[in-house]
Design a protein with these regions (language model features):
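Juxtamembrane interface helices immediately C-terminal to a transmembrane segment
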Residues: 29, 38-49
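Short, well-structured segments within or immediately adjacent to enzyme catalytic domains
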Residues: 44-279
Length: 279
C-alpha cells in the first residue's frame, strides 16, 4: 500500500509538470498572435487620433475661407499642435500614438528630444516655457504660407529655401494624395522626392538638422517589421513596415514606407519611378 501511495504521488507530480509544459508551449505559440493583435489595435487607435487632428485642422481651414496663408493656421500650429503643458508629467491625448508613448519626463529635458519608432518626440518652446510632445509629424509644406504672413520679415528666406511650398489650396492638385500628418520622429517635415531612406529604422537617422527629411517618417511603427527593429538596414532593400498618414482631403490610411515617395508632399513634387536607393 505504501508503495502504491508513493507511486500515486510521483505520477501526480509528473502530470503537473506535463500540464505546465503544455501551458508554456501554448503561450509560446500564442504570443506572436497576441503581439500582432496588440500592434493592430495600436495602429487603429493611432489612425483615429490622426483623424481627430485632421478634423481640427479642417475646421480652421473652413473658418478661414479655405486659405492656407491665414494667420489662424500659424495660431493653430503654435497653440494646438502636440500635447502641451507647463509640466507634462505624462503626455496623453490624440497627439500620442499608443505604439510611441512618451519615453522621457519632459521637464528633465532642456530642449527636448527626437522621437523613435517606439517613443514620442518632445519639443521645448523657450518663449512660452512649454513642452510639446507627439508621435506625429506635420507636412510643413502646407504651413509655410501662413508662416510668411505671420513673419513677413522672413518671407524672402522661405521663398529662397522652400520655393515648393503650397501657396494656396489651388496648388493642391490631388488632395487625396497630399499628406497633412504622418507617424514621425519630429514635429515637422519637408520631404522631397530625392530623399534617401534611413539606415537606422529606430531613429530614422534622427539628426535634427538633416535636409533629408523623409527619414523622419521612414520608421516601421506599424505593419510587418523585423524584431528587433534594425539600426543598419540596407538602403537598396525594400523598407519593412508602414506608418499612418492623414491626407489633406480628410481621410487617413496605413501607408507602406516605400510608398511615402509616391505621395504629393509639395506643390512641385514629382514621384520618382522608384524609391531612391533601390537598384
Amino acid at each position: 500500500m505504501k508503495l502504491s501511495a508513493k507511486s500515486g504521488r510521483a505520477f501526480t507530480l509528473i502530470e503537473l509538470l506535463v500540464v505546465i509544459a503544455i501551458i508554456a508551449l501554448l503561450a509560446a505559440l500564442l504570443s506572436p498572435a497576441l503581439s500582432r493583435a496588440r500592434m493592430k489595435a495600436h495602429q487603429v487607435v493611432c489612425l483615429g487620433n490622426q483623424r481627430q487632428i485632421n478634423l481640427d485642422f479642417r475646421m480652421v481651414l473652413e473658418d478661414g475661407n479655405q486659405r492656407l496663408d491665414q494667420l489662424e493656421f500659424r495660431d493653430w500650429e503654435r497653440d494646438r499642435t502636440g500635447d502641451r503643458s507647463a509640466t507634462l508629467p505624462a503626455a496623453k491625448g490624440v497627439w500620442i500614438c499608443p505604439s510611441a508613448p512618451l519615453a522621457s519626463h519632459p521637464d528633465a529635458l532642456s530642449w527636448g528630444e527626437m522621437g523613435t519608432v517606439h517613443s514620442a518626440y518632445v519639443w521645448y518652446d523657450p518663449g512660452e516655457g512649454l513642452h510639446a510632445s507627439g508621435s506625429y509629424s506635420r507636412n510643413r509644406w502646407l504651413m509655410i504660407a501662413a508662416l510668411r504672413q505671420a513673419y513677413p520679415e522672413d518671407a524672402s528666406g522661405w521663398d529662397a529655401n522652400y520655393p515648393e511650398y503650397f501657396r494656396s489650396e489651388s496648388d493642391i492638385a490631388r488632395p487625396a494624395f497630399t499628406p497633412f500628418l504622418a507617424d514621425g520622429v519630429f514635429p515637422v517635415v519637408y520631404p522631397r522626392a530625392s530623399d534617401l531612406p534611413p539606415r537606422d529604422l529606430i531613429r530614422g537617422d534622427g539628426f535634427l538638422f538633416t535636409t533629408n527629411q523623409m527619414r523622419f517618417l521612414s520608421i516601421p511603427r506599424h505593419g510587418t517589421r523585423p524584431n528587433p527593429v534594425p539600426t543598419d538596414w540596407p538602403t537598396n532593400q525594400p523598407l519593412p513596415g508602414a506608418v499612418n498618414v492623414s491626407f489633406f482631403d480628410g481621410h487617413g490610411e496605413l501607408v507602406k514606407l516605400d510608398r511615402l515617395w509616391q505621395l504629393d508632399w509639395h506643390s512641385d513634387y514629382r514621384p520618382p519611378a522608384k524609391r531612391p536607393g533601390l537598384p
